[in-house]
Swiss-Prot record:
GO terms for molecular function: ATP binding; enzyme regulator activity. P-II indirectly controls the transcription of the GS gene (glnA). P-II prevents NR-II-catalyzed conversion of NR-I to NR-I-phosphate, the transcriptional activator of glnA. When P-II is phosphorylated, these events are reversed. In nitrogen-limiting conditions, when the ratio of Gln to 2-ketoglutarate decreases, P-II is phosphorylated which allows the deadenylation of glutamine synthetase (GS), thus activating the enzyme. InterPro entries: N-reg_PII (IPR002187), N-reg_PII-like_a/b (IPR011322), N-reg_PII/ATP_PRibTrfase_C (IPR015867), N-reg_PII_CS (IPR017918), N-reg_PII_urydylation_site (IPR002332). It comes from the Bacteria. This is Nitrogen regulatory protein P-II. The lineage of its organism: Bacteria, Bacillati, Cyanobacteriota, Cyanophyceae, Nostocales. The keyword Secreted does not apply. The gene is glnB. Belongs to the P(II) protein family. Homotrimer.
Amino acid sequence: MKKVEAIIRPFKLDEVKIALVNAGIVGMTVSEVRGFGRQKGQTERYRGSEYTVEFLQKLKVEIVVEDNQVDMVVDKIIAAARTGEIGDGKIFISPVEQVVRIRTGEKNTEAV
């Protein structure tokens, strides 16, 4: 199994969720995160003064899937989250050794 973590723009969440649900993904975790990459932040104006927002609001979408679903999930996220502008986000893929459902004790595929 693999964990797919996607850092996306907040306004793209609904499109990403719909694309994944339509592809058969039945669960995901979404967290609010802040960070910066190549875009480094942005300059904003408030009451005539400029200031730099160094950490931009993003969302992290986490999904655990079988190995054979990873490419499909990544493709769906890219298609739904891409704007073509700097700041679209990143996708990280990492191995998952074990999953346990707390309520039932089910493990791995049965727990996802």
